[in-house]
Amino acid sequence: AGSYLLEELFEGHLEKECWEEICVYEEAREVFEDDETTDEFWRTYMGGSPCASQPCLNNGSCQDSIRGYACTCAPGYEGPNCAFAESECHPLRLDGCQHFCYPGPESYTCSCARGHKLGQDRRSCLPHDRCACGTLGPECCQRPQGSQQNLLPFPWQVKLTNSEGKDFCGGVLIQDNFVLTTATCSLLYANISVKTRSHFRLHVRGVHVHTRFEADTGHNDVALLDLARPVRCPDAGRPVCTADADFADSVLLPQPGVLGGWTLRGREMVPLRLRVTHVEPAECGRALNATVTTRTSCERGAAAGAARWVAGGAVVREHRGAWFLTGLLGAAPPEGPGPLLLIKVPRYALWLRQVTQQPSRASPRGDRGQGRDGEPVPGDRGGRWAPTALPPGPLV
């Protein structure tokens, strides 16, 4: 057949139709008057034999077709090129779990972030309540058209306010009744309220400071604020999604992120957003001359050091329609073009679950508290405050 095709190429009609000009399949069919011979010519004419490169992996078989190929996968494998084991999770596959994936003996299973439920295909995730995490309303997050007002914050961004009404730190709404912030911020004042983007103020009835927080070193500088009543979704705000470390490392961190936080403009805290990309620990450590631990992460963004950031800002990443929290800004970054060092929130996923799922045992907030090193907080009056110990169990 090969020699026959070669001879035909130099016959006037086929040479004119298919080599001097681009021909269509029907024109070649008129020359050969035979489907099998036409198909063999057409595969060569349209790019040769794709199966020659052995694109089907894991012992899959390949069948050439016009302008392409088709793989038949061996048992236990699937995907266009048979690259995916049916029992394993593969972050790069487009037809896999929309949110979280768990490998199994025969097949993987999917689950969804808070407020989402599995679709009929058992892979997609659909918001099913008003407080579904990581969703953005139509009002988010640009300036009102024709207005010079401040940029609207993400719906999970909140401010921390003291008893005198002064905003002093930022925080992140991770559930309708829990705000994540730094332990340092949570210890600054005894009386704390949370102010949402709609200027609703919610009293903090208790605080959970990580039991391994070290004020001197800044290790484990995280705290959860337990709100006296939940945020009214979606008007007052929406929580961001949280993720485990494996999902964050393999799926989220390779993607670009957004640092959404608060910066100082005079005495006012105004929202600011900055596109960031993940920086590998070794590179970040060299740039900052610091040790990057498993509980910290680095991000790089243009002119990040030019703004006066307030602690409690958050790095979020969008994945298939939902926004996930990957980093918490613990302190103002140094001036200059260097990367930002943040608290790696997914490393605290177990601690977050322990706190949010237990009965409320947080420290009550009086009008007078204990500052760091046990000194009274100036300007506040009333009761006493101390960090809450978590129930026995593993800590991350």
Swiss-Prot record:
Annotated Gla domain residues: 1-46
Biased composition (Basic and acidic residues): 364-375
The record's account of how the chain is modified after translation: The iron and 2-oxoglutarate dependent 3-hydroxylation of aspartate and asparagine is (R) stereospecific within EGF domains.
S-S pairs: C18-C23, C51-C62, C56-C71, C73-C82, C89-C101, C97-C110, C112-C125, C169-C185, C284-C298
Keywords, in A-Z order: Blood coagulation, Calcium, Disulfide bond, EGF-like domain, Gamma-carboxyglutamic acid, Glycoprotein, Hemostasis, Hydroxylation, Repeat, Secreted, Serine protease homolog
Sequence intervals crossing the membrane: none
(3R)-3-hydroxyaspartate carried by residues: D64
Localization: Secreted
One Gene Ontology biological process: blood coagulation
Residues that bear 4-carboxyglutamate: E7, E8, E11, E15, E17, E20, E21, E26, E27, E30, E33, E36, E40
Glycosylation sites per record: S53, N59, N191, N289, T388
Tissues in which the UniProt entry reports expression: Plasma.
Matches recorded under Pfam families: EGF, FXa_inhibition, Gla, Trypsin
GO cellular component: extracellular space
Domain called Peptidase S1: residue spans: 135-357
Gene3D superfamilies named in the record: Coagulation Factor IX, Laminin, Trypsin-like serine proteases
Region (Disordered): 356-396
Domain EGF-like: 47-83, 85-126
Molecular function via GO: calcium ion binding; serine-type endopeptidase activity
Top-rank taxon: Eukaryota
Family listed: Belongs to the peptidase S1 family.
Function (record text): Inhibits activity of the coagulation protease factor Xa in the presence of SERPINA10, calcium and phospholipids. Appears to assist hemostasis by binding thrombin and promoting its association with phospholipid vesicles.
Name assigned to this protein: Vitamin K-dependent protein Z
Gene giving rise to this polypeptide: PROZ
